[in-house]
Amino acid sequence: MPTTKLKVTGINHVVLHVTDVERSKRFYMEVLGFEDRNLSVGSSMKASFLRCGVQGLDLFEVANGDVHGGKEMNHMALCVAADDLDEIVTELSKVGVESSDRTPRNTVFISDPDGHRIEMLPFSASERALEREAARASR
């Protein structure tokens, strides 16, 4: 396969179809700490645009409730500022969010209110510092 000079530097946004925009918005903001981008779309559709760092999460309410129809997104992976997986699991359980058993890669999965799978990866302070240094060096 031919190569290009393009360099992908991160994910801009992920779009999820949901059954209730407000419920999903509360989940992502209150449980996972996303922020509201305060954007709007035409009045014919219900949507919410959130942010996690510089990445966006766009939630669109589907009229027929079929959030997994057609082309389903397999999952979204989130790096979580935590030193280990136990810290993530403990915090999630405090708010009633159940997680899967640990995977061989030391991650867990949770589901949002519409059943979208979310992989949670611990990302320690030292790992975050290394990533920031690598990003600065690549500029």
Question: Which residues does each PLM region occupy?
Answer:
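Short, basic, helix/turn surface patches
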Residues: 64-68, 88, 125-136
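N-terminal beta-strand motif that seeds the catalytic metal site of vicinal oxygen chelate
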Residues: 1-22, 74-76, 80, 127-139
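Amphipathic alpha-helical segments
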Residues: 22-36, 88-91
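Conserved short beta-strand elements that form part of the metal-binding/catalytic scaffold
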Residues: 35-70, 117-124
